[in-house]
Amino acid sequence: MEGENDPLLGSYKPKRRRSSLVYGLSRPQFLDTAASEVSPIPQERPTTSLRKPTPRVQRPATDVSYGALEETEENESIASGLSVQEDFNSKAWWKELTLLIKFATPVVLTSLLQYGEVVTTVFSLGHLGKTELAAASLSNMTATITAFAIYQGIVSALDTVGTQSFGSGNYEMVGLHLQRILAILLLIQFPIFLIWWKIEGILLFLRQDPLTCMFAAKYMRVMMLASPAYALFEALKRFLQVQGIFHPVTYILAIVVPINIFLNYLFVWSPWVGFGFLGAPVAVALTLWSACAVLIIYIMKVNGRQAWGGFSREALKNWGPLCRLAVPGVIMICSEYWAFELVTFASGVLGTTELASMSVLSTTSTLSYNLAFGVAAAAATRVGNLIGAGNTKLAKLATHVSINLGAAIGVIIAVILFLTRNTWTYIFTSDKDVVALVATIIPLVALINIADNTQCVAGGLLRGQGRQRIGGVVNFIAYYLLGLPVAIILCFKLDWGLYGLWIGIGAAILIIAGVETWCSLHVNWDHLVELANRQFDEA
């Protein structure tokens, strides 16, 4: 079969099946950018695809659609070996920035739409009564810290093996890694189901209100229907993202979120088929399974199938390299989730006003974090693809641009929060005590968000570089050996209250931002390419 050699890799690459409707790319724009900017890097790499590779169709290097860069003098300067600092004012720098923003935007919208599903549930059940509202909030928190955050940590391994495999042209390896991820997610459903089935006793042990625990236990048992769907959706979403396909998930959620609102009304409030409190988790389960079904149809019929080589028994073997990325990814993500939940729990000890204020501040911080998370996801895909392609110069530039973009977003949001500190809280509540308390603390939270946005992007870069272990270790030490102890001491021993809690958690975030940013920027890029090659061989 005829084919051509890729100038980046010097070896045959498999052909991708081209879709008639292109939301992503037949060849990722991330790699077209690389091909147009970098002089050929001759290197031999053994093909690790399970099947005999077929030639890949390569679009012209001068194609500027979907973010590909034009051939310019600035691009040539990168290829000729100029440092990244010397190119920061070049057209290539701004093209890189535009590309990241373009692909971060749908990820941000996706995160906000997914968050909207939770808001819909809380809003719907909140009108049934305060016990139902408390039970829904407690259930959502429990589901997040015992399952959903773990799923996100596991699928984050695709940020490394998926992006690098796709960047190297080993497209079907992405599908193989996806199958391994799905197998792991399936296995951990069983211990999670056991915890959820016995959750009432666990919550009572933690001294929660007995009536709230009873409602939460019923809610969690119904949510067992939604748990596999959430895991599948996260895996499929990441499967598309590592291919540079970002928009379809946003479009799908834009369709199913209104459906979720309708189902909440139908199952919770409708006089014909509504059955009250338990109607909300049923609506969540149906919404998630519907989203999965549409996403699978999109992949098989429109775009994304090019990285799916079919089911293989190889997916049941050689989980070691994947687990070595997934475990620190879980620690990296769950450490942050759990730390914030513990701080929220501690604020409840201070009183109702403090708990309500913490809720406002945490929600504000989450909204800010979602913006940075979009940049982190795009940066992980971008850098991982470029490492897989052997394009270290452009990977270095993308890293610098990503860090600067994350910090800039944090600064902009900090300024907005500072200027609206006396009015922002009225979006959530009109309680004067809560408004006054939030107004005194939100300048501190605004400053913390600068570091939080930066560390979020740096964490994404570490995942794209395959260095999750650094993030896992740094997050655990910063939050649990420094941040939380300091927060508890300042809050309860020195009576600094909510201010002390945020100083403690802010100190942890500042350390994480500094260490992870330094690590993501100071990299032996050639060594990362060698590690990627080694992972291909192991897989």
UniProtKB/Swiss-Prot annotation:
GO CC list: fungal-type vacuole membrane; membrane
Membrane-spanning ranges: 103-123, 141-161, 184-204, 244-264, 277-299, 325-345, 360-380, 399-419, 434-454, 470-490, 496-516
Entry annotated with the keyword Cell membrane: no
Chain residue ranges for the region called Disordered: 34-63
GO biological process: xenobiotic detoxification by transmembrane export across the plasma membrane
Subcellular location: Vacuole membrane
Matches recorded under InterPro entries: MATE_euk (IPR045069), MATE_fam (IPR002528)
Chief location category: membrane
GO molecular function, one term: antiporter activity
Pfam families: MatE (PF01554)
CDD domains in the record: MATE_eukaryotic
Membrane topology listed for this record: Multi-pass membrane protein
Keywords associated with the record: Membrane, Transmembrane, Transmembrane helix, Vacuole
Family in the record: Belongs to the multi antimicrobial extrusion (MATE) (TC 2.A.66.1) family.
Protein name in the entry: Uncharacterized transporter C4B3.13
